[in-house]
């Protein structure tokens, strides 16, 4: 038993299904000095498995007319797909695959780290309001994981590695 709980809420108004997979892991579960790792791993779960190439997960969802995305918070990370209801089995298989079989190498991880750094620049570093919120949160939660930004501190994101990402994935996902 891996603790997976399934909740099904029927809605017959449209022939679509929305699948959300919520992992009980987020930024608050990161080790000191590894801020941003939970969010980084969220990005990396779209980068391929033993049976899917990098980016193929989202391409397959789009090919069947669906959409997908993910988000990270302090206490959880969630992945979702919305597709025609007859494609539910397809997306469940894809999620099960990346839940167990993520494959990472520096060729995939290092460019994605740059993507996360750019995301931080655009959302936080280039926004005085976002910088203020980040500093207020840091002051409110001294010596607590909630004081670190979910996206991570720039200097710590720069030091995230393939090994750290795989260790986090194995501990919290696989």
Regions found by a protein language model. Name each.
Residues 3, 12-61:
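Active/ligand-binding-proximal structured segments within catalytic/core domains
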């Amino acid at each position: 038993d891996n603790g997976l709980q399934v909740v099904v809420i029927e809605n017959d108004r449209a022939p679509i299904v929305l699948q959300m997979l919520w992992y009980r892991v987020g930024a608050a579960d990161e080790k000191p000095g590894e801020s941003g790792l939970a969010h980084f791993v969220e990005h990396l779960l779209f980068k391929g498995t033993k049976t899917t190439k990098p980016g193929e997960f989202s391409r397959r969802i789009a090919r069947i007319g669906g959409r997908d995305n993910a988000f990270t918070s302090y206490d959880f990370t969630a992945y979702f797909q919305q597709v025609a209801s007859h494609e539910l089995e397809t997306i469940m298989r894809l999620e099960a695959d990346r839940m167990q079989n993520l494959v990472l190498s520096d060729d995939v991880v290092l460019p994605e780290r740059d993507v996360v750094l750019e995301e931080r620049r655009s959302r936080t570093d280039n926004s005085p309001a976002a910088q203020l919120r980040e500093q207020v949160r840091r002051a409110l939660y001294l010596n607590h994981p909630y004081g670190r930004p979910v996206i991570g501190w720039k200097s710590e994101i720069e030091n995230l590695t393939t090994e750290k990402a795989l260790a986090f994935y194995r501990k919290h996902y696989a």
